[in-house]
UniProtKB/Swiss-Prot annotation:
HAMAP family: Glycerol_kin. It comes from Methylobacterium nodulans (strain LMG 21967 / CNCM I-2342 / ORS 2060). Its EC number is 2.7.1.30. Sn-glycerol 3-phosphate binds at residues 12, 82-83, 134, 243. This is Glycerol kinase. Keywords: ATP-binding, Glycerol metabolism, Kinase, Nucleotide-binding, Transferase.
Length: 502
């Protein structure tokens, strides 16, 4: 009997379920989209039932597609949008409020007050994060303070908090399991990443009762079994990780110094720093990459707010292209003499600048600027921002050699050969595109398969990582330096200050 791994990839706009074979190839894939809700400016919410129904429906659809039953599934692995926050009734399972999504900015005022009171150094030292509405801690506090009766019920032990993984585990197990993994816990502002435990000082700071919190476990291990009524037989749940950490695992970035970058609407790059957390001096985040056998592996993380969204803007905002797939071909026809730069700060700039209030700009426009130059500027903006992240990572990590680290890439944008070649050119480093594009789901599947014995130890799994294509630098050094200097000049104009070379 074929043994399969069912990977649940719960994202911001859709949920996907994939069945992986023992050789890590995909046997089935199902996807269901669901709406986001925007009740006020800067607010983003999900209906918890949408998260649950889309998960259940896609899992069942993937099983039907593969002609497989629950007994052919060795284990389930879950990966999820991080930081999105839910609180529900322990007895009924009913959420007390819609899920507050990671993009939501409603707690900006609370974060600003806590910064003014001098609390950010404590938060950063314990958690590796910044005091920002992005993370779960202030979202929890908002729900407790704004939903009538929620704080009293939480103090009485009647409520449970979880990121999306915890909520799905609760629902899948029929309310028998209230747990999370270390990668998701590390995104809450409440978890000491050095001790691997919830932090009492931070709980007091945000006024959150410990009884609300899930138990924290390894990323690969026992997370309970599904209610037998859901799929016809119980299925063990054996792996959990936040989406960017799961992609790091799926890319087999197990050695210190290995870097992966995921390109979707935005971009997230993680550098494995091994068993020791590295405090950033360049506004990167320090986070847990994964936890296996009680041992934590850490990473430096940088986030770019706009990657694929720049191409969506070309298509939907300007009408420059009819489809995203056209952008690379159009960029290839751009005039090399036209040095046009797009700084895509549509919602501010992320790492390593963290300037939420600046807005985007185009530099270098002339009467000769055409759609081709705009397309090139949009795609190059992603490459320039990645170069900024990797420069910050090399500066932060003392064990890095500062030379051309290979970058492993995944996400929708990596299908563009032109963009990947330009990325390699501007990084002066090889860019590796894997054969298996669904690296986030593969990471969740691997963590589950490792726990149930279907997949080998990390070192052997890494040997089976399959390269589809390597892009190697082909741009002359002086050209690269001129283009990077032009980018930093454009960013400096936007910020109103010089941006130094790394």
């Amino acid at each position: 009997m074929t043994r399969l791994i069912l990977a649940i990839d719960q994202g911001t706009t859709s949920t996907r379920a994939l069945l992986f074979r023992p050789d890590t190839r995909i046997a089935a894939l199902a996807q269901a989209e669901f709406p986001q809700h925007f009740p006020a400016s800067g607010w983003v919410e999900h209906e918890p039932e949408d998260l649950w129904r889309s998960t259940l429906d896609t899992c069942r659809a993937a099983l039907r597609q593969a002609g497989a039953g629950a007994r052919e599934v060795a284990a389930i692995g879950i990966t999820n949008q991080r930081e999105t926050t839910l609180i529900w009734d322990r007895r009924t399972g009913e959420a007390v409020h819609r899920a507050i999504v990671w993009q939501d900015r409603r707690t900006a005022g609370l974060c600003a007050r806590l910064k003014e009171q001098g609390h950010e150094p404590l938060v950063s030292e314990r958690t590796g994060l910044l005091l920002d509405p992005y993370f779960a801690g202030t979202k929890i506090a908002w729900i407790l303070d704004q939903v009538p009766g929620a704080r009293a019920r939480a103090d009485a032990g009647e409520l449970a908090f979880g990121t999306v993984d915890s909520y799905l585990l609760w629902r899948l197990t029929g309310g028998r399991v209230h747990v999370t993994d270390a990668t998701n816990a590390s995104r809450t502002l409440l978890f000491d990443i050095h001790r691997g435990a919830w932090d009492d000082d931070l709980l007091r700071l945000f006024d959150i009762p410990r009884s609300l919190l899930p138990e924290v476990r390894d990323s690969s291990g026992d997370f309970g079994t599904t209610d037998p009524d859901l799929f016809g037989a119980p299925i063990p749940i054996r792996g959990v990780a936040g989406d960017q950490q799961a992609a790091t695992v799926g890319q087999a970035c197990f050695r210190p110094g290995m870097v992966k970058s995921t390109y979707g609407t935005g971009c997230f790059a993680l550098l494995n720093t091994g068993p020791q957390p590295v405090a950033s001096r360049n506004k990167l985040l320090t986070t847990i990459a994964y936890q296996l056998g009680g041992e934590r592996t850490y990473a430096l993380e940088g986030s770019i707010f706009v990657a694929g969204a720049a191409v969506q803007w070309l298509r939907d905002g300007l009408g420059v292209v009819a489809s995203a797939a056209e952008t690379g071909d159009l960029a290839e026809r751009a005039d090399p003499a036209q040095e046009v730069y797009l700084v895509p700060a549509f919602v501010g700039l992320g790492a390593p600048y963290w300037e939420p209030d600046v807005r985007g700009a185009l530099y270098g426009l002339t009467r000769g600027t055409r759609p081709a130059e705009l397309a090139r500027a949009a795609l190059e903006s992603v490459c320039y921002q990645t170069a900024d992240l990797l420069a910050a990572m090399r500066a932060d990590w003392p064990d890095g050699d500062g030379s051309g680290t290979v970058l492993r890439v995944d996400g929708g944008m990596v299908a563009s050969d032109w963009t990947m070649q330009r990325l390699a050119d501007l990084l002066a480093a090889p860019v590796d595109r894997p054969e298996v594009k669904e690296t986030t789901a593969l990471g969740a599947a691997y963590l589950a398969g490792l726990a149930c014995g279907l997949y080998p130890e990390p070192e052997r799994f890494a040997d089976h990582w399959r390269l589809e294509r390597r892009f190697t630098p082909a741009m002359d050094g002086p050209v690269r330096e001129r283009k990077l200097a032009g980018w930093r000049k454009a960013v400096g104009c936007l910020l109103g200050r010089p941006v130094p070379l790394p």
